[in-house]
Amino acid sequence: MLDKIPGQITCEDFKYFVRTISERAPAKRGISVRALEKFINTHKLQSHSVEDFISAVILPQTGNGKCSFASLFAEHVDKGPAAVPPVGAVTHFVCLSNTRKPPFSLVVAALVELEKQLFSADTENLSTGAAMYVWLDMLCLNLHEVTHRATDQPPRRAWEMEDHNIIADQVIEQAQEFVLFLDNWQNPTVFSDGPCLCELFFAQVSK
């Protein structure tokens, strides 16, 4: 999402992004990973990268309402008699870092596998239709607010961001899983992107 902000990404942009997440992370609404997997398969989006998914699916679908994709997700999923509700109370908070190029289907597959591992020892949960609902930043944030800030906003004062480390720590503490995506060493994008370095740093120091 950060690369969608017009112009060069600055530390202030990253701080704004972190603060936006911290303000909305406790939201109760999450998306079922199984419903998300079904959505991707139904619409043949397996080859879409995270970046493609945002630009081709999320932004167009939410353009009129200027809302999060999670707000509209239930309308785009077929509801069978045995289907898990596509939207429910959050069970896991997930924040993606540096996953713009890999297929989004791989991210979802990893979450589906995590759900299987969590419920593997609890057959009762599986039989009763229990599901993992994730608060996934790209799906549950209003990307129109995050990526297109008003240009007439007054500049933020320095003291407003002094609590940045505290806010970032709170965001990381809410995350229950971290997934590391390795980049091609011949083109190590992650090491040339300041915000990515910040995210990796916070993930490490908060372990």
PLM regions: where:
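The feature represents the membrane-entry module of six-transmembrane cation channels
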Residues: 1-207
